Amino acid sequence: MFLSYSLEAGMKVRSFPLVQEAELRALIAEGAEVEIVCLHEADKEARNRGEWIILVHRAEGERLVLVSSRSKHRIFLRFEGLCAYAAHTLELGEIHIPMREGESCRGMYHRDRQPRTR
């Protein structure tokens, strides 16, 4: 699926191709890198409610954004839900989550393909 999605984080507008969960999981299992982007800063008063999206980086340098089965962008609203999805559904070896709007964290891989740094 190669529709485009406009992401507005601060003043920057980016357009990424879309990927559904099944293809995303396959890409990650093959060794693709995962990035999590914070769209709206987590609110401590609201039990860490914020907004995050997940991107995957293909080997060709292309970035794809996760969408639901209905081609709607998948935005995670709760920190806990994002952690559970990344750990159990995507089976990431480690999870890094940005907490400030506009920030992102990269370098996450499938737990069986995690580069050994230690």
Model region roles, listed by residue range:
Residues 6-9, 18, 64, 68, ...:
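Generic, low-specificity signal for short hydrophobic/alpha-helical stretches with a mild N-terminal bias
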Residues 73-112:
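Short, compact, well-ordered microdomains
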Residues 41-71, 92, 99-100:
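Short aromatic-glycine-(Arg/Gly/Cys) micro-motifs in beta-strand/loop hairpins
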Residues 2-11, 15-51:
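Short N-terminal "domain-start" leader segments
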Residues 16, 71-74:
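Pocket-edge positions in alpha/beta enzyme catalytic cores
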Residues 24, 28, 36, 54, ...:
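Generic hydrophobic secondary-structure signal
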